[in-house]
């Protein structure tokens, strides 16, 4: 995934009202940019961090600039725009870059399914293969050398796990795909210390046949690509 045009950098002043952030450019101009991430963004939004932002040519947008990446003083890259995760994974599957999905040829997005009025992020289909339902989650929380999901209590995420479990119990393929969007993370676990219910539901889902797959993204101001497969820890 390439950023067109390449992202521009600025220094973070503050994030506020969840959806907004103030930054200062190298030229000294203060900008208010949009933040698509509604999560806690723990460790991803420290004042003084380098922010990389994109610019929309849509004249109707109140805030034309969007926060895409954070570069920390430690040298870590973090994608804070959670909307990028689905595109990143779909692109990798289409390019046959994820061996676990190499047998599937058709990719559909945001397909209605389940018993709780849900939409699956990615539905993969192929002749002589069961359908593969993929729910994509972004992992950006780094604590004690481990990446955790979620970074806040998520009833929506809990619903997705119930839906995936039901799909697996029907004999179809159900996958929880963790797109690791923090370069400092080298393993992933459920954040039981943040959302115990989510952690418990994930364990139940795995016991019912839901697969958990983790891949890390390589990121720069020019683009992103999925790289190494990471280990998911059962804690």
UniProtKB/Swiss-Prot annotation:
UniProt feature coiled coil, ranges: none
Disulfide bonds: none
InterPro entries: SfsA, SfsA_C, SfsA_N
Highest rank taxon of the organism: Bacteria
An example molecular function term from Gene Ontology annotations: DNA binding
PANTHER family from the UniProt entry: SUGAR FERMENTATION STIMULATION PROTEIN A
Family, per entry: Belongs to the SfsA family.
NCBIfam families attached to this UniProt entry: sfsA
Protein name, UniProt field: Sugar fermentation stimulation protein homolog
Gene: sfsA
């Amino acid at each position: 995934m390439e950023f067109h045009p390449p992202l521009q950098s600025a220094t973070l002043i503050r994030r506020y009202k969840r959806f907004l952030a103030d930054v200062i450019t190298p030229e000294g101009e203060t900008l208010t940019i949009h933040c698509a991430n509604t999560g806690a963004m723990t460790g991803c939004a420290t004042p003084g961090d380098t922010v990389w932002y994109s610019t929309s040519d849509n004249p109707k947008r109140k805030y034309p600039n969007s926060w895409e990446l954070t570069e920390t003083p430690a040298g870590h890259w973090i994608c804070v725009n959670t909307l990028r995760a689905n595109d990143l994974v779909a692109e990798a599957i289409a390019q046959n870059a994820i061996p676990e999905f190499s047998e599937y040829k058709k990719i559909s997005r945001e397909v209605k399914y389940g018993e709780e009025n849900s939409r699956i992020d990615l539905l993969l289909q192929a002749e002589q293969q069961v359908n593969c339902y993929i729910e994509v989650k972004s992992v950006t929380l780094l604590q004690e050398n481990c990446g955790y999901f979620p970074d806040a209590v998520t009833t929506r995420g809990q619903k997705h796990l119930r839906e995936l479990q039901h799909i697996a119990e029907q004999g179809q393929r159900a996958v929880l795909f963790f797109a690791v969007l923090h370069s400092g993370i080298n393993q992933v676990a459920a954040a039981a210390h943040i959302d115990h219910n989510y952690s418990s539901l994930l364990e139940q889902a795995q016991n019912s046949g839901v697969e958990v797959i983790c891949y890390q993204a390589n990121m720069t101001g020019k683009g992103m690509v999925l790289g190494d497969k990471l280990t998911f820890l059962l804690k």
